[in-house]
């Protein structure tokens, strides 16, 4: 049977990434408290394509995914990418995995337990060297310092999303990153709150106002202090409750470069 994908292409144009995208697939993730956690991921898998090949073999991506479905973790991510390169005759391979991750949280006053969902991601690539990035998206509450200062009856507050991505030299637990990020907002977010919890969360946020600039700077300070992390990016987006726009801030640091531990600037003013 003829193999059309292997036929020669005469346009002399290589392709950086080609593959399969948005695969819904069950995976098993390492859990700090329960050893493992079963979840369902959205997965993208790509390789490069040399200029002389007409196409890649899409079915081979799924075959490789089937082999690693119970073993998608940092320990074997490089081996999975190497298998992609070999099976598809590629010079580079890439995989992006996004999945919901659940942590049991206690409400701050009542102690009521509930599961909290966080969006997490793995991004890995292999060409001449292996690269891996762990990412998390954490909802928090933010309360505007400027609104609090100017108002007699309260301050506007809103739900925010903080996104942190890290490269590291030693293993980092998802739970540990989430704990760091949740401490950078005015208050954490909970899936279950009783009346006494709502009072606690509301008052805590009011006593702990944060600009979006404050949030990314506080996260940066904490991540700079973690020796096992070599690179990171931090983003914060406030879904403003009294504006028709979001507030946004971002910081990226490569700790292997000189000067990344310099003191950061003071928070910006309300504008």
UniProtKB/Swiss-Prot annotation:
The record marks 144 as: May be catalytically important. Keywords: Hydrolase. Coiled coil: none annotated. One of its GO terms (molecular function) is GTP cyclohydrolase I activity. It catalyses: GTP + H2O = 7,8-dihydroneopterin 3'-triphosphate + formate + H(+). GO terms for biological process: tetrahydrofolate biosynthetic process. It comes from the Bacteria. It is an enzyme of class 3 (hydrolase). Signal peptide: none annotated. Its EC number is 3.5.4.16. InterPro entries: GTP_cyclohydrolase_FolE2 (IPR022838), GTP_cyclohydrolase_FolE2/MptA (IPR003801). Pathway: Cofactor biosynthesis; 7,8-dihydroneopterin triphosphate biosynthesis; 7,8-dihydroneopterin triphosphate from GTP: step 1/1. Converts GTP to 7,8-dihydroneopterin triphosphate. Belongs to the GTP cyclohydrolase IV family. This is GTP cyclohydrolase FolE2. The lineage of its organism: Bacteria, Pseudomonadati, Thermodesulfobacteriota, Desulfuromonadia, Geobacterales. The gene is folE2.
